[in-house]
Curated annotation (Swiss-Prot):
Subunit structure: Heterotetramer of two alpha and two beta chains arranged as a dimer of alpha/beta heterodimers.
One Pfam family per UniProt: Asparaginase_2
UniProt: substrate binding residues: R250, V251, G252, L253
PTM characteristics: Cleaved into an alpha and beta chain by autocatalysis; this activates the enzyme. The N-terminal residue of the beta subunit is responsible for the nucleophile hydrolase activity.
InterPro entries named in the record: Ntn_hydrolases_N (IPR029055), Peptidase_T2 (IPR000246), Taspase1 (IPR037464)
Hydrolase is among the record's keywords: yes
Organism of provenance: Arabidopsis thaliana
Source taxonomy: Eukaryota, Viridiplantae, Streptophyta, Embryophyta, Tracheophyta
UniProt-recorded Gene Ontology molecular function terms: threonine-type endopeptidase activity
Family: Belongs to the Ntn-hydrolase family.
Catalytic residues (positions): T222 (nucleophile)
Protein's name according to its UniProt entry: Putative threonine aspartase
Length: 408
């Protein structure tokens, strides 16, 4: 991919991406590595521009992830119990603190486009008659708003689904639909035979969980991107098709403020502190824990480093949920970037010096990639735990990347 007009090869930047926590089958690894590489390059093309903005870079990278059928976002997303695609997405700008999210939006190829525009309109305050710009839109209303702003391809939900719904997703939906029907029939029979008992209902729930776990490729919820530009501006975003067989209208982690992504240029007490975080997992318990915001806050307060903060938050939300009723998957992944930017000449703009990147995950695998101006090509990895499937724990990866020129 070649840089466009106005590209400045001396501009410093950094981009980190992930394609979800869960289990990534070896057969899909090549496709996932390819899409992460292309997402990194799409963001870098914008960040090398003199006028390139982090919001646009995050949006461009996530659009690449949404358009690829190997991810659970946009095309190839998990289907609702009704057999349709409903997407969640959000984007946050670290400088302004503005957040834009869309939830359960049907018939949209790139939900991140709507989220990005929501952020921009809040920053500019461009509304008629002084109305407050929306921060979160859901369902058909989000789709209509996107069409009114000309950020969506014209067409009906049915027409969009023809592109969004892949054969793999449809086959998975049919398989899960049959499983649910079978379990439902057994539950009715069990209730008739044991009207006051719960043992058989619990067995049915366990059967569903074990059948789902046996699926070859099980990727939980979101994809995400974090971008930092030459001046130390930071932004991040998330996008997701949601969990398989979700109830229509369910709004998940990727659309929720403070949960799916978080970016900030200041610490809790107002001092400069550049940090961005994206979270992936079975969303409800991560939403209750405000996982992305908590990770950034913990990092700013402890100064122990991104890896320590990510592992601490992941262990905390897992522990809080461990005593609650239910057999839902509690695995997750957290990707966090802390950036260092300083003013070299008094009165001038800050300049990006280095970043620290960390990934913490309790899942069997977590697909991550990153790229910066001092790196020859994107570094891509499907991180895999050495733990057995039944073992609980948190693994991590961390690296520090110096983005300053190596010679004068």
């Amino acid at each position: 991919m070649m840089a466009g007009d106005g590209a400045d090869q001396s501009r410093r930047f950094f981009v980190a991406v992930h394609v979800g926590a869960g289990y990534h089958a070896a057969a899909n690894e090549k496709a996932l590595r390819s899409v992460m590489r292309r997402a990194c390059l799409a963001a870098s093309t914008i960040l090398r521009q003199d006028s390139g903005e982090c919001i646009d870079a995050v949006s461009a990278a996530i659009q690449v992830l949404e358009d690829d059928p190997s991810t659970n976002a946009g095309r190839g997303s998990n289907l609702t119990e009704d057999g349709h695609v409903e997407c969640d997405a959000s984007l946050m700008d670290g400088d302004s603190g503005m957040f834009g999210g869309v939830g359960a939006v049907p018939g949209v190829r790139n939900a991140i486009k709507i989220a990005a525009l929501l952020v921009k309109e809040q920053i500019t305050g461009s509304t008629l008659l002084g109305r407050i710009p929306p921060m979160l839109l859901v369902g058909e209303g989000a789709r209509r708003w996107g069409k009114s702003k000309s950020v969506l391809i014209p067409g009906t939900v049915t027409e969009a689904d023809q592109w969004l719904v892949t054969e793999r997703a449809r086959n998975q939906w049919r398989r899960f639909k049959a499983m649910l029907s079978e379990v439902g029939a057994k539950s009715i029979l069990s209730a008739e035979e044991h009207p006051r008992g719960t043992e058989n209902n619990e067995t049915c729930e366990e059967n569903v969980s074990s059948c789902a776990a046996a699926d070859e490729d099980k990727i939980m919820d979101t994809v995400g991107v974090i971008c930092v530009d030459n001046e130390g501006h930071i932004a991040c975003g998330s996008s997701s098709g949601g969990i398989a067989m979700k109830i229509s209208g369910r709004v998940g982690l990727a659309a929720t403020y403070g949960s799916g992504c978080w970016a900030s240029s200041k610490g809790p007490f107002g001092a400069p502190f550049l940090v961005g975080c994206c979270v992936s997992g079975a969303g409800e318990y991560l939403m209750r824990g405000f996982a992305a915001r908590e990770c950034c806050t913990s990092l700013a307060l402890s100064q122990a480093g991104p890896a320590s903060a990510a592992m601490k938050v992941l262990r905390s939300v897992m522990h809080q949920e461990s005593s609650k009723i239910g057999t839902a998957d509690k695995t997750a992944g957290i990707l966090v970037v802390q950036a260092d930017a300083s003013v070299v000449v008094p009165g001038s703009k800050p300049e990006l010096n280095a970043v620290e990147i960390a990934a913490a995950y309790s899942s069997l695998s977590f697909g991550v990639g990153y790229y910066g101006n001092s790196i020859e090509k994107p570094k891509i990895s499907i991180l895999r735990t050495r733990r057995q499937m039944s073992e609980a724990g948190v693994d991590h990866f961390e690296a520090r990347i110096d983005l300053r020129p190596t010679c004068c």
